[in-house]
Amino acid sequence: MTFLGHAAFRVEGGGLDGLIDPFLTGNSMTPFSPGDFKDVNYIFVTHGHGDHLGDTPDIAKRTGATVVATVEMCGVLEGVKCHALQIGGAFTFPFGRVKMTPAWHGSGVQVGEGEGMVYGGVAGGFLIEVDGRRIYHAGDTGLTVEMGLLAEDGVDVALLPIGGNYTMDIDD
């Protein structure tokens, strides 16, 4: 697993070369650019805000990667292969199982410069099972009761927001 800055991560193993929330262009926290990812086969998008959706369309179109997101986000993303999940839904992909988890946050998608936002469905997180490990990416969210349920089931790696103001904070 590689931290790419902000909420972006790369997860590799078991046939998965995946990106989570690939906000790279304009992200001062990353040395990476979209062109650095040539073999990505899945992209997981927690919600539609630009600092999470990021470079998803460009990378997905260039690599042929499948985007995993809500049905509403899949409807907004044109010209990409998309697998829709909703909160509580799960699917077994060739590399392993993915479950979409609840998040308390918005999910508007910016459409053009100064044109406002369109509805991008609910925000979520992902529990990704690959190579015998369970990776939980919470997306942007406040603290939720469901996080405790995930902990009871066992999570090997938890990727949690700690920014405060728009999300939970380090004290949570």
Predicted feature descriptions by range:
Residues 1, 42, 68:
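Catalytic phosphate/metal-binding cores of nucleic-acid and nucleotide-processing enzymes, i.e., regions
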Residues 1-3, 23-30, 80-84, 139-141:
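Short gly/ser/thr-rich secondary-structure transition/capping motifs
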Residues 1-4, 18-21, 97-103, 134-140:
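Active-site-proximal beta-strand elements of phosphoester/diester hydrolases
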Residues 2-12:
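Mature N-terminal segment immediately following signal peptide/propeptide cleavage
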Residues 10-49, 54-58, 72, 106-118, ...:
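Pre-active-site segment of Zn-dependent metallo-hydrolases
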Residues 68, 145-172:
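Cap/insert and terminal regions of metallo-dependent hydrolase folds
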